[in-house]
Structures are given as C-alpha cells and as structure tokens.
Amino acid sequence: MYWLKKNIGRVEITELSASARLEGLRAEQEHFLGPSFGPISAYGEHGAIVHYSADEKSNVPLKEGKLFMTDTGGHYLEGSTDITRTVALGEVGNIEKEHFTLVARAMLRLANTVFLYGCSGANLDCIAREVFWKEGLNFNHGTGHGVGYLLNIHEGPINFRWKEGERPAPALEENMVITDEPGIYIEGSHGIRLENELLVRKTVKNEYGPVSYTHLRA
C-alpha cells in the first residue's frame, strides 16, 4: 500500500500492474509457497463487482479520486492467508468515507466478539451486519468463511452467514481460523471490503454451566 500511494499519479499504474507488483512483493517474503487464489484488483466501480477479475479487456489505469480494492492471499509454511484492503487514492467523496467507516465498524465489531461455546457463525453474523441494516444497507455474500491450510482458501463447514443453509452450521471450536470480511457495493460507483483472518480462542469458564466463553482473535 505504501508503494501504491507513493507512486499513484507519478507513474502509470493499472489494475493489472498493481496486482503484479503486490504479488511480487509477497513472493519475496520468507517461506512463501505460492498464491492461495487468483487476486482481485479492482479500481473505482469495478470494486462493486464482488468477484471481479481484471483482464486485458477490463483493465483500467488507477488515478487519484477513487477507491482501490485488493483481495489477495498466499500459502506459507506457517499458514494460508486471505486478506482484503480498500484504500483511497487521493481525496475521495464523503459517501465513500461514510461507507468505509461502516465497513470498518462492522469488521471490528465481529473481530472483538465474545460468545458462549456452542455458537455457530450463523449466531454471530448479525453482529457485523447490524451496522449496515440500521442504514438500510446489506451485502450479498457471507461475512466470513473457514480457511484451509495449503488447500481451498474457502473451506467449510464453518462460516459467518445470517441465514442457515441446508445443513446446520457446526459450532466454532478453538483454533479454527475464519475470515471477517463485510463490505458495501454500490453499482457504478465503488466497492469497499475489509478482510482479516480470525482465530477462535477460549477464554474463561463461569457459572453458566460446562461451557466456556470464547473470543475471536485477529
């Protein structure tokens, strides 16, 4: 991100060249084994396409005044990652700032949740999503998914979704890794998503029976 903000407006940068540069920096990291999925590099209105994939036909230059979203990940000896960041290139409008604040609030609310053992992702999803619902907004994807080590980066059966699927979601267990990735997508304008990986950790037992309070750790 430092490289991007330092060079935007000074040299030509496109969605594809930005993605290549960021992937190249990752490849220089110790114990890097390879990308964990195809990167998403989305500028401006392309950010509103949840699974946008830049190619030679859709590729556009990055300029100041809009948002840029990058969703990338890598496989390492120590684990696999899936991380999304959205950054402002120069000054952006008030609506983009307001939407970014909503997404950040939602992501942090879920990341700091403490819950009783036995809860599934379906019990917790609304903790993040309520921030949007109060503003008449929503996003049409899960708030998080399980992460596979050197396998599928989207790995079940755990997830954060407000609606139960055909099979009941299992309880979150200690040491499970799950993503936290709320977003806002405004067609023709912008998209914002922030994504971290969370580790499920036990905390304390109390008088409410043979269960432990559990919390998520970013």
Predicted features, each with a name:
Residues 127-129, 146-149, 195-201:
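Active/binding-pocket-proximal capping segment
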Residues 33-34, 111-125, 137-143, 179-180, ...:
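Acidic/polar loop patches that form or flank catalytic/metal-binding clefts of enzymes
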Residues 49, 94-101, 107, 111-112, ...:
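C-terminal active-site-proximal or functional interface alpha/beta core segments in diverse enzymes
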Residues 48-78, 155-205:
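Acidic/histidine-enriched ion/cofactor-binding microenvironments in catalytic or ligand-binding pockets
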Residues 55, 81-86, 145, 190-197, ...:
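Composition- and surface-driven signal marking solvent-exposed, interaction-prone regions
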Residues 2-7, 11-60, 66-109, 124-127, ...:
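Hydrophobic, small-residue-rich alpha-helical packing segments that form membrane-like cores
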Residues 35-48, 143-159:
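Short, basic/aromatic beta-hairpin or loop at an interaction surface
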Residues 214-218:
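Conserved small/polar residues in nucleotide/adenosyl-binding loops
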